[in-house]
A protein has these predicted regions:
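Intrinsically disordered, low-complexity repeat segments enriched in small/polar residues
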Residues: 5-8, 23, 27
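Bacterial N-terminal signal peptides that target proteins for export
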Residues: 2-14
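Initiator methionine at the very start of the polypeptide chain
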Residues: 1-2, 29
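Bacterial N-terminal signal peptides
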Residues: 12-23
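Ser/Thr/Pro/Gly-rich, low-complexity intrinsically disordered stalk/linker tracts of secreted
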Residues: 28-254
Length: 254
């Protein structure tokens, strides 16, 4: 094979692989939405795969979500108190048949211990960065942790998830965020998730970024009109809020 033919074949293969990635939803280069609300700035992002979904029958998907928070001037950001996610009315959540883990089982546990104790209830993973800054201290201390999402059960129309993180500064501590998910009727949105973040380091810790991916089948969706929408709202301890929406294309079939 000469060089020209070799380049041609390589180019065709590369295009074919790219097309497969796009069609199957494995490409994750979707742009985030950026919100600037002085003195704060935030980015929200999210997506799902596969992108080809039934128009009428819920299709299991892998769901991902992420966020970043900062002060425009680079100083210590405010502490995140809640994160609300309004999901598309064509999406739903189900934890049926998955073992349950309680908040009590996760408290005071390291990441390894949480995974060992509640492994069968693990439904997602991710990572987070926290900045800790005490009034008398300079500079801010960056702390990174894995995120583990566990099934907390379904009762009375509410699905509960527990998201576990473990920090070692200033003292070792487990941070367990409770997420409550319920159905709503709000135009395009039909699912509301409210994540309540506990105080970190006595209120001196702030979430700077997070990313989380839920296992395939926790979220299912249909694609009747070519897109799925979501809207995130960050609520900070200082009383401010920041909101932004994303629209992700999908291909309906059947």
């Amino acid at each position: 094979m000469n060089k020209l033919n070799g380049r041609y074949v390589f180019g065709v293969v590369a295009l074919a692989v790219a097309a497969i990635l796009i069609v199957t939803g494995l490409a994750v280069a979707e742009p985030p939405v950026k919100i600037v609300q002085p003195p704060n700035e935030a980015e929200f992002n999210g997506g799902f795969s596969p992108k080809v979904l039934s128009k009428t029958k819920p299709t299991p998907v892998v769901f991902s979500i992420s966020g970043k928070f900062r002060r425009i001037d680079g100083s210590h950001p405010p502490a995140l108190k809640e994160f609300l996610l309004e999901g598309d009315k064509h999406a739903g959540i189900s934890v049926k048949g998955i073992p349950i883990c309680s908040q009590r089982e996760l408290e005071s546990r390291t990441t390894e211990q949480a995974r060992k104790i509640c492994g069968p209830a693990l439904i997602g993973t991710g990572k987070t960065e926290v900045g800790i800054k005490f009034p008398e201290q300079e500079p801010e201390i960056p702390v990174n942790s894995e995120l583990l999402a566990f099934n907390g059960g379904f009762k009375g129309g509410l699905t509960t998830l527990f998201i576990h993180a473990y920090i070692t500064v200033p003292t070792p501590a487990a941070i367990v965020t409770t997420v409550k998910v319920k159905k709503i009727h709000k135009g395009r949105y039909g699912l509301l998730s409210i994540a309540s973040i506990p105080k970190i380091a006595g209120g001196s810790g702030s979430v700077k970024s997070f990313s989380l991916k839920l296992n395939k089948g926790i979220i299912s969706a249909t694609c009747p009109d070519g897109h799925l929408d979501a809207r995130g709202t960050a609520v900070f301890a200082e009383g401010t809020k920041m909101s932004g929406g994303v629209v992700r294309p999908c291909t309906g079939k059947g």
